[in-house]
A protein has these predicted regions:
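Alpha-helical segment of the N-proximal tetratricopeptide repeat
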Residues: 21-40, 44-47
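Short, strongly patterned local motifs
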Residues: 255-301
Length: 301
């Protein structure tokens, strides 16, 4: 196998994302955003929006960023994802901002604390939380997985070595802490192999153990393509894609002349979005849902 991603080493040093103006068409909204009054900016944007007139792409970008800022991560990330597929000929600055907005750094204190305590990379927690719940703390899946890391209650209780509750698991700090412990457990089980660890988070380690295991001659990507569960194969690709997005940090899509450069990443097309409805049952003790399968109405479940 190729050299594995070092998901248990400290995160690479990254500059925090620089503040960016909203660039809405509405002056009041822009000013409130500049002042850090994001909830007031969102209310002002809603008051000025005309539902009868479809907003242009740059205004949809502003709306998606506003939704993320006020905690509507479910709709915000969904809107930004669709915009990334449909926006024709954005400027390089718009393309860069759209890409970065799809990898928000939310719950930073909770994630950093959980990652340091468990000995896993914070970027891995971000990558999984984005796919599992879109960072929505109140999400409860039809199978009963709860919170930002979509922990099954039985897994959470095992990691806590004490009884847990749905209310507790809806708290981001507790959920990230227990989710990070579970990730560390999987990484230990699979000798720090990121591919089997990520697949196990979705399908359960028992299922992954039953599959053909990679050898020294195998290419990592080839092993992922051979995952027999379509949903887990898709899930693993998306989490790795998220991880690369977060590791990219302040990546720019402008070349030296300022011209736009391509943004589309592996897995970012409509057919991949539809694949999330082909969910396999979780045969193990791990999480068994991802963000694209949970109905929006469930995020406060």
């Amino acid at each position: 196998m190729a050299e594995p991603l070092a998901l248990r080493s400290p995160d690479p040093q990254q500059e925090p994302p620089a503040w960016q103006p909203l660039n809405s068409h509405h002056r009041l909204v822009n000013e409130l955003w500049r002042l850090g009054q994001v909830h007031a900016a969102w209310e002002a944007w809603q008051a000025q929006a005309d539902p009868a007139v479809p907003p242009p792409p740059e205004e949809r970008l502003a709306e998606g960023r506003l939704r993320l800022a006020v905690g509507d991560t479910w709709m915000g990330l969904d809107q930004l994802w669709w915009l990334s597929l449909r926006w024709r000929n954005p400027s390089c600055h718009q393309r860069t901002l759209l890409h970065r907005s799809q990898f928000p750094r939310l719950f930073e204190a909770e994630i950093q604390t959980a990652a340091e305590q468990a000995g896993v990379q914070a970027n891995l927690l971000r990558a999984i939380a984005k796919q599992e719940s879109r960072f929505a703390p109140g999400v409860v899946s039809p199978a009963g997985a709860v919170g930002v890391m979509q922990l099954m209650p039985s897994t959470a209780t095992e990691m806590a070595d004490a009884p847990t509750s749905t209310l507790m698991l809806k708290d981001p700090a507790d959920n990230f802490e227990l989710g990070a412990r579970y990730l560390n457990h999987l990484l230990e089980q699979w000798e720090s192999d990121p591919f089997r660890s990520i697949a196990s988070y979705n399908a359960g380690p028992g299922a992954v153990a039953s599959w053909a295991q990679p050898t020294d001659q195998d290419d990592d990507a080839l092993w992922v393509e051979r995952i027999p569960y379509p949903e887990t194969r898709f899930y693993t690709k998306k989490v790795l894609d998220n991880l690369l997005g977060y590791l990219g940090g302040n990546q720019s899509f402008c070349n030296e002349t300022g011209a736009g450069m391509g943004q589309k990443r592996a897995g970012d097309d409509a057919s991949d979005h539809d694949q999330t409805h082909q969910k396999q049952a979780d045969p193990g003790g791990g999480q068994n849902t991802d963000a694209d399968e949970i109905e929006p109405g469930q995020q406060h479940g």
